Amino acid sequence: MVEYWTLDRFEIGRLLGRGKFGQVWLAREREKGFIVALKIIPIKEIQTVETARQIRREIEIHSNLKHPNILRMYGHFHDKDNIYLILEYAGKGEFFKFLSDRGGKFGEKETSLYIRQVMLALTYMKECNVIHRDIKPENLLLGSDNQLKIADFGWAVYNADKRRMTFCGTMEYLAPEMVNNDIHDSGIDLWCLGILTYEFLMGKTPFESKNRNMREAYKKINSLKYTIPETISSNASDFISRLLVLSPGDRMELTEALNHPFIVKHHGRSSD
């Protein structure tokens, strides 16, 4: 039976955050009382055909993904003014804030815990033929049970086996193939995984430039110019260096990464 949603079925609470195309509000479904995050996208802000296509694609992809480390989309509806996305409520909120409150970085055990959860989600997404293309702390949430949740599928695409040329992502996380406007595939998420691991451990991204100078950042990316301090273990260093590889085909695959010593030391081998 198809569930039909309308806004009057929800009691709207406090503002949780603002995104590129709208706001996210805490909400309670009146009949059953369950708590959700309601993303409200004003239709007037969808000003191009490409934006409309991107939002439709985001809804299609996100609503079909069901994994403990991916924020659930329970449904969606619209009226004359807005599009509404009914999302899982992540009780501990924005992962970026959680990271900032911890001084901007984690120790190796905690880093490996959260990176493993990202990898489990990416493994599932690969099975579903999905590339996220914008993995970064700002697109992660944290559930009440400390489960990391990948959110914001605005740049996600189907057909991970096809090679694409759309330029997307965040400057500090851009893979070499994106910087050089080359075709790209699911290898882009492996690069982002390496950047994320580095940032969790170091409190900054590896290819940062002064005043966010794009040309300087791109030069560093293409030359793999970054440093790892000696205080970082050889396992962690090796894990990062095997993901931050210029050629996408030479990056460590997720199955190998899940069983890398950096992960196994703290969490055991994975059968995923």
From Swiss-Prot:
Catalytic function, reaction form: L-seryl-[protein] + ATP = O-phospho-L-seryl-[protein] + ADP + H(+); L-threonyl-[protein] + ATP = O-phospho-L-threonyl-[protein] + ADP + H(+)
Top class in the EC scheme: transferase
Gene3D superfamilies: Transferase(Phosphotransferase) domain 1 (1.10.510.10)
Family that this chain belongs to: Belongs to the protein kinase superfamily. Ser/Thr protein kinase family. Aurora subfamily.
Pfam families (UniProt xref): Pkinase
EC number: 2.7.11.1
Binding-site positions, ATP: 16-24, 39
Primary subcellular site in the record, as a coarse category: nucleus
GO terms (BP aspect): chromosome segregation
Stretches assigned to the Protein kinase domain: 10-263
Keywords: ATP-binding, Cell cycle, Centromere, Chromosome, Chromosome partition, Cytoplasm, Cytoskeleton, Kinase, Kinetochore, Nucleotide-binding, Nucleus, Serine/threonine-protein kinase, Transferase
UniProt KW Transferase keyword: yes
Listed SUPFAM superfamilies: Protein kinase-like (PK-like)
Catalytic residues identified in the record: 134 (proton acceptor)
Entry GO MF terms: ATP binding; protein serine kinase activity; protein serine/threonine kinase activity
Localization: Nucleus; Cytoplasm, Cytoskeleton, Spindle; Chromosome, Centromere, Kinetochore
Protein source organism: Encephalitozoon cuniculi (strain GB-M1)
One GO CC term on file: kinetochore
Function of the protein: Component of the chromosomal passenger complex (CPC), a complex that acts as a key regulator of chromosome segregation and cytokinesis. Has a role in error-correction of aberrent kinetochore-microtubule attachments to ensure that sister kinetochores become bioriented and connect to opposite poles by promoting spindle assembly checkpoint signaling.
Protein name (Swiss-Prot/TrEMBL): Aurora kinase
Gene: IPL1
